[in-house]
Amino acid sequence: MTTPFKRIHLIVMDSVGIGEGPDAAAFNDEGSHTLKHTLEGFKQKLPHLEQLGLGNIAPLPVVSKVTHPGAFYTKLSEASVGKDTMTGHWEIMGLNIMQPFKVYPNGFPEELVKEIESMTGRKVVANRPASGTQIIDEWGEHQMKTGDLIVYTSADPVLQIAAHEDVIPLEELYEICEKVRELTKDPKYLIGRIIARPYVGEPGNFTRTSNRHDYALKPFGRTVMNSLKDNGYDVIAIGKINDIYDGEGVTEAIRTKNNMDGMDQLIEVVKKDFEGISFLNLVDFDALYGHRRDKEGYAQAIKDFDLRLPELMNHLREDDLVIITADHGNDPIAKGTDHTREYIPLLMFSPKIKDYHELSQDTTFSSIGVTIADNFNVELPKYGKSYLKEMGVEHQ
């Protein structure tokens, strides 16, 4: 049996939601609409996303509705009970997460802090949500003098530990993070990722190094990626995908520096021979602009992505399928700094398909994984549905 598509390239525009989800009120996210609010007042067009049909999913500034879209289009709602990166990505690959990860907007509980101090023999300082650059500017010199651990979090379910590489050697920092990872698997903490955040430099001129390391939880079940790998297909993880799934189901992992490097790496992968999926996360939308409520920066990042699409399209093969989607929202005009509970856009196109239309809207993130699994004829997740029939493609 031949597969409809030999390769599927899945791109997650991290946090690029397309309007409040049906249960947004339960998350205090009524009225959230990342794309609409980001693009309001933006003066530039997004011609390639427009031609694909992004503006057909929902009315958007600077992105018009088109009569002949260049992709299948719809929007998907989230079934899982979280609105974080891991929950969104895990659901995309077929899981339904009913136990939400915990976030710590007021810092970590004293009980956990004491356990970390006891286990490591080092004092914990900071212990609050903060940007990584801000926290080392504030505590970096203190850390160099004392050897304390700078512990901080964000709007995501993460515990980050920053330390100067000359004060706490990398191997020791990694060992500390591994111990904290084990400690926080306890359901009463349930933190998604522990992140080592080493830095170098002198007071007033600290910089974080590329020696960051993430210690994630394994997905709470088998994903489509596991099924693909088990059946001999390639699963090429680009950007933070490998960390999000803790390597589960990944056959090759490629790190990226930023969104544009992510697109560079994807295009290099597209040029290679393989059979299976490439899976790219573009994190800058979320990390650099959404959480920081930087509307202008966010809009420009979407424009920059739009400009790269022709280059990607030029390297596609006849039996490739591209899927562009998101994992949650992060409305830059919403109160606070947290993610927002939103629908995600879904655009799917292939050189071998000429006529596109709207797909049904009655389903959830996991339908992406089901469609991929159906294409490669591997085990289908329990949740979601395949879009292959609606797309008019079948197994031969």
From Swiss-Prot:
The keyword Endoplasmic reticulum does not apply. It catalyses: 2-deoxy-alpha-D-ribose 1-phosphate = 2-deoxy-D-ribose 5-phosphate; alpha-D-ribose 1-phosphate = D-ribose 5-phosphate. Its EC number is 5.4.2.7. One of its GO terms (molecular function) is phosphopentomutase activity. Its cofactor is Mn(2+). Mn(2+) 2 binds at D286, H291, H339. Belongs to the phosphopentomutase family. This is Phosphopentomutase. The gene is deoB.
